[in-house]
Amino acid sequence: MRLNDGRSFSCRSDQTVLHAALAAGIDMPYECASGSCGSCRCRLSHGSVSLLWPEAPGLSARDRQKGDRILACQSTPSSDLEINVRAGDALLEPPPRRHAARVTVKETLCASVIRLVLNVGGPIHFLPGQFFILDLPGAGRRAYSVANLENAAGGIELLIKRKIGGAGTAALFDQCAPGMGLVIEGPYGRAYLRADSARGIVAVAGGSGLAPMLSILRGALARGFGGPMDLYFGVNTAEELFCVPELSALQAAGARVHLALRDGGPGPAGLHRQAGLIGDALVAGEPDLKAKDLYVAGPAPMTDDILARTVRQEAIPADRVFFDRFV
């Protein structure tokens, strides 16, 4: 496989172009790695590919009409390929790998969220805030963020919210059980903890977006970060709150935890709560965001609202905002 800048790398017929490029240390652009965002869109100048998800929304109708646009995360090679893409010089994150994993824990946290713990049987490497892709038989590939830190024991903790009508979450909620084997691929993700930054940390999570924010704050604490850390966690109702013991532990370790309950219901004792949208809570609680690093994860409407309020309206530098839009 050859890029327009002359670099080349190997890609198996069962491997996506994105996975192969990253595994080869090539910094190919991407965001969701699951076909929805379009960030890994590139032009196929020679060769042919097979598509894992032919209807992936990351390609627009105009892209499809052109006939030579592909999503690197959804394309496996059927021949030698030449691809036109603007790739960076060197990959800064751990390269993705495929792992055989086994479910060790499945725990219901609230009516719509489960905790799933997988184990790959050996050391697992990822940066705080990254995610893995799960191959789900009959449901395709789904991306889920990790809540814990890399470790020698091979454990991966996922917080998964049921998506109404979603085949992936249906498989995990209704069919998955301890002892079940799964194939996972990763790590992926660019919204990881910038460990070399001395700026304060503001983490914003909507729903299961709490998983990567837990990982980021745990990672900062593990590195001895002594600056200010604030976590804003938004849900619709008090019944949708989860991981309250983990939130309390973060607060005890020095982070400030802010809960935003859209319906204004009561919150758990010991944690600051306010009614309304998480974006309102963020703007009210952070008058000096320009001096901090902002991490955001959650549903696309929430993420887009936060970006509009911060990058566009408040002119916060884009290179200090790291987001994972769940689509």
UniProtKB/Swiss-Prot annotation:
Cofactor: FAD; [2Fe-2S] cluster
Binding site for [2Fe-2S] cluster: C32, C37, C40, C73
Pfam families: FAD_binding_6, Fer2, NAD_binding_1
Reactions catalysed: 2 reduced [2Fe-2S]-[ferredoxin] + NAD(+) + H(+) = 2 oxidized [2Fe-2S]-[ferredoxin] + NADH
Cofactor: binding details: Binds 1 2Fe-2S cluster.
FAD-binding FR-type domain segment(s): 96-194
Induction details: Induced during growth on aliphatic alkenes (such as propylene, ethylene and 1-butylene), epoxides (such as propylene oxide and 1,2-epoxybutane) and chlorinated alkenes and epoxides (such as vinyl chloride, cis- and trans-1,2-dichloroethylene, 1-chloropropylene, 1,3-dichloropropylene, epichlorohydrin, and epifluorohydrin). Repressed during growth on other carbon sources.
The entry's keywords: 2Fe-2S, Cytoplasm, FAD, Flavoprotein, Iron, Iron-sulfur, Metal-binding, NAD, Oxidoreductase, Plasmid
Similarity section: Belongs to the bacterial ring-hydroxylating dioxygenase ferredoxin reductase family.
Name this protein carries in UniProt: Alkene monooxygenase system, ferredoxin--NAD(+) reductase component
Organism field: Xanthobacter autotrophicus (strain ATCC BAA-1158 / Py2)
